Each structure stands twice: as structure tokens, then as C-alpha cells.
């Protein structure tokens, strides 16, 4: 069955795998999903990810990160801008949870965090928030 919102599918797969305490999860490949995975890796929310090319279609295998007591590094991950209600924010985007969490934006500079958007003076579509 085709997915109408690939970003929500990406978020849901990661959230569900974290709640089920899975070490890895497989996500259908797209360049956008690869860029979001790279950003989550850079910010320390996931352990690693690899792009696996199979005969039928490529996938992204995400290795989830857990603390010493077994809690997921991702406490909350929520879609903000949806197909029915797009959310855009300017270069003066506010901090999520006073800077403890991140907004992930799609801007003219690529997939960036709210902190990077403020530093570069750009805005964009707020894809999701993560804490």
C-alpha cells in the first residue's frame, strides 16, 4: 500500500521501534529520509544508519540508541507540518522546550535544525520536533 506521507511514516517507524525496544528498524529509502537520518545521527538521537541496496528496493537500516537503563534516546518525536496543514516558520523560529529539544526544518539550505536556521537566518517548513 502506498504511503501518502513519507515523513510521518519515517517518524512512526522510529517511534514504534523505540517503544518496542528494537535495536534496528528498516525504512524504505528516499533522499529526504536519508538526510533526516543523517541529521538524527549528528545530533545523537540514533546510533547509526546504513543504506542497504536490495534487488527490489533500497532501505535505510536505522540503529536506535538506548541509555544505560534501556530508555530510548528519543523521548518524543512528533510530526508538525502535515499534508493537510503545512506549518512554516521564519528565521526567528522559537526554541523547542527551551532548547532541550529540536525542530527539524526543510529549508533552502536543506534539512536543518531550528538552531542552524536561526544561525543562518533562514526559515522553512517545520517537519517534526524531537526530544
UniProtKB/Swiss-Prot annotation:
Taxonomic superkingdom: Bacteria
Keyword Ribonucleoprotein attributed: yes
One cellular component (GO) term of this entry: ribonucleoprotein complex
GO process terms (BP): translation
Keywords: Ribonucleoprotein, Ribosomal protein, RNA-binding, rRNA-binding
PROSITE patterns: RIBOSOMAL_S8
GO molecular function per UniProt: rRNA binding; structural constituent of ribosome
Subunit structure, as described in the record: Part of the 30S ribosomal subunit. Contacts proteins S5 and S12.
Homology family: Belongs to the universal ribosomal protein uS8 family.
PANTHER family according to UniProt: 40S RIBOSOMAL PROTEIN S15A (PTHR11758)
Record-linked NCBIfam families: PRK00136.1 (NF001109)
Protein purpose: One of the primary rRNA binding proteins, it binds directly to 16S rRNA central domain where it helps coordinate assembly of the platform of the 30S subunit.
Protein name: Small ribosomal subunit protein uS8
Amino acid at each position: 500500500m502506498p504511503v501518502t506521507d513519507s515523513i510521518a511514516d519515517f517518524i512512526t517507524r522510529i517511534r514504534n521501534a523505540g517503544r518496542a525496544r528494537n535495536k534496528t528498524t528498516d525504512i524504505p529509502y528516499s533522499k529526504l529520509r536519508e538526510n533526516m537520518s543523517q541529521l538524527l545521527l549528528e545530533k545523537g538521537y540514533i546510533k547509526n544508519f546504513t543504506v542497504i541496496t536490495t534487488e527490489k528496493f533500497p532501505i535505510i537500516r536505522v540503529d536506535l540508541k538506548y541509555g544505560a537503563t534501556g530508555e530510548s534516546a528519543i523521548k518524543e518525536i512528533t510530526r508538525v507540518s502535515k499534508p493537510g496543514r503545512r506549518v512554516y516558520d521564519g528565521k526567528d523560529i522559537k526554541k523547542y522546550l527551551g532548547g532541550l529539544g529540536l525542530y527539524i526544518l526543510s529549508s533552502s539550505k536543506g534539512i536543518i535544525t531550528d538552531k542552524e536556521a536561526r544561525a543562518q537566518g533562514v526559515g522553512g517548513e517545520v517537519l517534526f520536533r524531537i526530544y
